[in-house]
């Protein structure tokens, strides 16, 4: 149990996808203007990562990994070269299902997210988490914990940034730094803050 707790904490704080690896920056910077929208997108990313990482883990180990087709009589088969296409296909299907669910049950959030919801399909944070799962050879249980933890970490980062940006609307920001300029500086300072967690050994 301790292993899974430490894996979750590492995914949220120490190896934060947004602030340690700078993945998903396009959506991270574009949607982080309002806290409510950021929370909505953060929840969507948690759901997509929490499902896509373990599902892709199953697909990889059952079909794509070297020797995984032994049960079909092909012990030497290695389909790992197809993993990028397969992972993107699985992620795209899950995002499409999520998009339809939000459109039906949460139309206000669906309209607020706009084009950035389907862009989760090609969000490098999603694909990066799935790639890390393969690279680190996580089992199914670890992939579930890591997927949820990575999603929570990304959601935490975008919500914190949105809160800061809302406060900065009332600040006296120099003209040359208004907009994305001060946002980049803020993200860099947040990343420095999260870097302090790297000294924790779990």
Curated annotation (Swiss-Prot):
What NCBIfam families does the record point to? nqrE (TIGR01940)
Q: Which domain of life is it from?
A: Bacteria
Instruction: Specify the enzyme's EC class, one word.
Output: translocase
- The answer on whether this UniProt entry bears the keyword NAD reads yes
Membrane-spanning ranges: 11-31, 35-55, 81-101, 114-134, 144-164, 180-200
One GO BP on record is:
respiratory electron transport chain
- This chain belongs to which protein, by name? Na(+)-translocating NADH-quinone reductase subunit E
Task: State the organism's lineage.
Answer: Bacteria, Pseudomonadati, Pseudomonadota, Gammaproteobacteria, Alteromonadales
Q: Which Pfam families match?
A: Rnf-Nqr (PF02508)
What is the catalytic activity of this protein?
a ubiquinone + n Na(+)(in) + NADH + H(+) = a ubiquinol + n Na(+)(out) + NAD(+)
How would you describe this protein's topology in the membrane? Multi-pass membrane protein
GO MF term set: oxidoreductase activity, acting on NAD(P)H, quinone or similar compound as acceptor
**Its EC number(s):** 7.2.1.1
Q: Where in the cell is it found?
A: Cell inner membrane
- Please describe the quaternary structure of this protein: Composed of six subunits; NqrA, NqrB, NqrC, NqrD, NqrE and NqrF.
Q: Which GO terms describe its cellular component?
A: Gram-negative-bacterium-type cell wall; plasma membrane
Encoding gene per record: nqrE
InterPro entries cross-referenced by the UniProt entry: NqrDE/RnfAE, NqrDE/RnfAE_oxidrdctase, NqrE
Q: Which family would the database say this protein is a member of?
A: Belongs to the NqrDE/RnfAE family.
């Amino acid at each position: 149990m301790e292993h899974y707790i430490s894996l979750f904490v590492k995914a949220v704080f120490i190896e934060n996808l947004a602030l340690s690896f700078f993945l998903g920056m396009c959506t991270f910077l574009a949607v982080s203007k309002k806290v409510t929208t950021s929370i909505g997108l953060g929840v969507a990313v948690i759901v997509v990562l929490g499902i896509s990482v373990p599902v892709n883990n199953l697909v990889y180990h059952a079909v794509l990994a070297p020797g995984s087709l032994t049960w079909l009589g092909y012990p030497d088969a290695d389909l790992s070269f197809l993993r990028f296409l397969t992972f993107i296909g699985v992620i795209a299907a899950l995002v499409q299902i999520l998009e339809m669910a939000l459109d039906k049950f949460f139309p206000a959030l669906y309209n607020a997210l706009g084009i950035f919801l389907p862009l989760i399909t090609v969000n490098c944070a999603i694909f990066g988490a799935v790639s890390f799962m393969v690279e680190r050879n996580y089992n199914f249980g670890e992939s579930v914990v890591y997927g949820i933890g990575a999603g929570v970490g990304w959601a935490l980062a975008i919500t914190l940034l949105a809160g800061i940006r809302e406060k900065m609307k009332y600040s006296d920001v120099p003209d040359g730094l208004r907009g994305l300029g001060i946002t980049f500086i803020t993200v860099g300072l947040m990343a420095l803050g999260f870097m302090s967690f790297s000294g924790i050994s779990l």
